[in-house]
Amino acid sequence: MRICSQYVGLRKVYEMTEFQSFKISKFERVALNSFSGLVFYIIPLFFVLIFVLVIPDVILAQETSEDDGLEDVLSGFDDEGSDEDEALSGFDDDSGENITEKETESATEEESWKQALLNFSGSAGVSTSYSYAKDAPADKTQADWSGMTKLRPYFSLTWDAKLGENWKTRISGKAFYDLAYGMKDSETFSDEVLSELEKEAELREIYLEGSPFRSLDVKIGKQIVAWGVANSLRVVDVLNPTDSREFGMTDLEDIRLPIAMTKLDYYIGDLKLEAVAVHQIEFNKSAPFGGDYNPSTQKLTEVIPESSMENTEYGLALIGTFGGWDASLHWAQYFDDTPHIKITKVTIIPGIGAVPTFEQRHSRLTMGGVTLSIPSGNFLWKAEAAKLQGMEFALVTDKLFSRTDVLVGSEYSGWSDTSLTLEFGVQHLNDFDIKLEESPDSQLEDRIATTVSFMQDYINQTMHLNLFGMMIGKNGQDGGLNRMSLEYDVMDAFSVTGGAMLYQPGGNDYFQSLNENDRIFFEARYSF
């Protein structure tokens, strides 16, 4: 059963992603083949061409059309004889008014074009990290994850446009190229690492949003639907997959991945009824095989359900605000973003024994949940609870399991420019079978996670301190992490950030694999 023992590390990776079904959120799998590599260059070029070619042409066309129209109007008056001037003088004022109206209409039209074409926002910068705890491998054929592990220039661009009075659209994209791999022997890194971490270009949010009726909002396209009231541990927030390639290093606004959905919001007084249909089946971006956040020694086949009408995911939410406190009910039927392991066959090898063949599958789950948020003075008390049904495991195949997730937390904002947040979450596997403790399932009846976040601003809110900590287990005995960062706004549009990430190994195999992943990081960002 040597293969089973090799698999323990891999299972612990998914054991950790079970906590990411709490999904650590204070923090389209892209296999960049030749086509997507071409997309990497096309996306920035497309936006540049809009600026360079389209905008000047549109403005020039507007100005030329306006000038030609004005000349045509005035030319008729230039041809008239002087003896007719007095007779026509009464019409001159009206003509002037017509010209003024046309100029106003043209100016308004030109302004609307400018707003539609020039309403861009985005950011550009460079993100770096340095792994100081890990030594370079003695074997030069192995990947070197010591020293500079990231030197990543990036660029993101968002175009927002208003379409009439009740509709608007958004198109956003993001691209990066990591120079750190070229600074080392790139041939020692796995193909999965290079394809997923060296470069990436993707379209993110692409949607059309509007209100066909006063009480109804419609949103169609790639989007993010965030459910729940928690800041760092997620319970009912199950619709969007997440980017977990660098565990603990990704912020909330970046961790959720937009996917193709249709969302309807219907308003009834203080209530909102939300209905969601997810058309695109896509799962978490996990650390690639061979990466410093993936300790597994073997690759497994992942079975991804086809995006079809039959596999459409659904969600319903009833959200209300009552005298200052908020409550919501949630229901969803979806594929679990975290795969389970299925034993597809067992081969008997003489001298070794039974060798199983593993495969990653995604269970079809049904979730019912509730959230509550109550302000009280300087405190905000919040809670989430959900029951998930339909969970599958490798070692117990004769039944489906359910799990109950509960979260409680509080935010305190009584200090000036300061926020303190504490959250505590438990995942309880119902009708637990002791067989599930063995590999490859490696399940626990109860998983416990606690997080604390402290944020404070200084120097007229231009310097921002952010401290985040998480511990696994009742007393942190299974591991944890600490992240510290300090951001300074050099000017309105330019900021720099520096910090450190420390991992606590504990008794959890996955956190033990991160013991030498401690690093310092730096980012410079220009926003426009």
Where are the language model's segments positioned?
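Detector for outer-membrane/organellar transmembrane beta-barrel domains
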Residues: K162, S373-F393, T397-M471
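Transmembrane beta-strands of outer-membrane beta-barrel pores
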Residues: V126-Y132, A175-L179, I224-A226, I268-D270, ...
